[in-house]
Amino acid sequence: LDRRRQRQMCIRDRYNSMPFHAVSWHKSMERFGLNISPEEAYQYEGMRGVETIKLLAKRQWNKELTDEEAANMYEEKSNEFRKCPKAEKMDGVEELMRKIKTDGLKIVVVTGSGQRSLLEKLESEFNGLIHHELIISSFDVKHGKPNPEPYLCGLKKAGVMPWEAIVVENAPLGVRAGVAANVFTVAVNTGPLPQKMLADEGANLIFESMPSFRDSWNLLSENWKNR
């Protein structure tokens, strides 16, 4: 390992928006006759929306939806989400990102979202921390999480190898994707799911909240530099 090379941090969660997404999934899919409770929605966090819908349709209707059919249904979910209040930044995430930036790491955002308004907001609200050329969205990949493609794409954009990166995830499917990409994966449990679900997907480290990870960053960073 050339320790002079630029290293990379892939971060998934920046806003505390999942409670709104969960309710939006429930309300919108109910109109089509698909059942997904707000609690269940957390299990699919990080997956591309159209893939979530196709999976639900296959399980509940035994029907293979086309990409166009799923995209039309996802638009209903997006419209429902737009009615929700503005999501605040995840507690502790901006301070964490500033520490990461100070340590000289590239920050790559990997999101399953395809909402252009969110992608534009990321760069403006995290000024100097997030850059559009280092955002991986649903537009950049054919296969979303739990497939490793989003993180492999992030590695390629940053120009680093898997052992030169850390994935920060808060969803089981995202953890699975990070592990499958052979990247050291930190799970931060920001939702209601039991920590065992994150552990079962192979997370290398698990923190109970974003502030606890932020407060532990200096120690983790020092250990990582000395690998």
What do these predicted regions represent?
Residues L1-R7, I11:
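Single conserved hydrophobic/aromatic residue that forms the stacking wall/gate
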Residues D13, T111-S113:
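Conserved phosphate-coupling serine/threonine residues in phosphotransfer and NTP-handling enzymes
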Residues R14, K89, I107, V167-V168, ...:
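Conserved SAM-binding loop
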Residues A22-Q43:
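Conserved phosphoryl-transfer catalytic core
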Residues E30, K101, V179:
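Anion (oxyanion) recognition and catalysis
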Residues G46-F81, D91, K99:
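A metal-dependent, Asp-based hydrolase signature
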Residues E68, E94, R98, G114-R227:
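Asp-based, Mg2+/Mn2+-dependent phosphohydrolase catalytic module
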Residues R82-V109:
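Short, acidic loop-to-helix structural element flanking the phosphoryl-transfer center
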